[in-house]
Amino acid sequence: MLEEFLQFLGFVFLDIIEIMLMLKLFSFISAIPFRFKKIFYLGLAIVLFQVVVWTFLPDYFTVEVVMMEELLFFVLIALYYGRPIKPSLLVFYGLLPMVVTSLIKQFIVFFIAPLFGLPFTVISQNTFLSYGFLCFSIFLAYFFVKLYHYDFSSWHQNLKSVMADRLLLVTNGSMFLYYLLLHGIDLSSLNWFGMTSTTLRQIIVIFYLILFLTLLAILDRKVKQHLLQQNGSVKRKEVS
């Protein structure tokens, strides 16, 4: 009994660390300022909610439910703390940290880790190894944003066109669908053309990775075009 309780406390601790790291990534992406105290309390709140569900509604405490609940949590956090930024962009801010981290982790787990003798089945059955890959993926997501010089915090000022708004809605919808397929549905219960759930996940990850990077590139180009137009207008006014 004591061993199970200590193991449970270990999982709670790992959950809090994971949520706090994800909140820090969210704050970095959206430029919505979160102090350490707020990050800690928000992380603790979501984990305590999970503990309550696990205690009183154990039948509903599944991996799929927990993952979708965390996604909803980040969207609600973005909508609450990001006002008065337009809702579609706040939803983007809420979805992006979870989806980018998931894409990086899934790519590593499916295509890189097996090269070092760590197949998906081994990682998925080892909780601490899975958490380790997740935390590592959060750090890689941070460096991904830094490497490609994405300034998502400026998008609310520079995504002004109707086309950009539509692209943002498509991006949000695709991120939610990806997360639902990878984390909200038990793919092992599906049988698509005789493929295993692992093969199906690999196809989804590769397909969405290409789609996601394409959508980000288009949106980023829209932002830069708007900035160039603004700079051109300012220079013309200075000349005149």
Describe every region a protein language model picked out.
Residues 9-16, 203-207:
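Hydrophobic alpha-helical transmembrane segments of multi-pass membrane proteins
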Residues 239-240:
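Histidine-centered phosphotransfer motif of kinases
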Residues 1-7:
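Short, strongly hydrophobic alpha-helical membrane anchors
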Residues 141-158, 179-194, 203-236:
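Juxtamembrane or sensor-core-proximal signal-transducing alpha helices
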Residues 19-23, 44-47:
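Primarily extracytoplasmic/secreted proteins
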Residues 12, 20-39, 52-172, 185-191:
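Juxtamembrane segments at transmembrane-helix boundaries
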Residues 40-49, 171-178:
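Alpha-helical transmembrane segments
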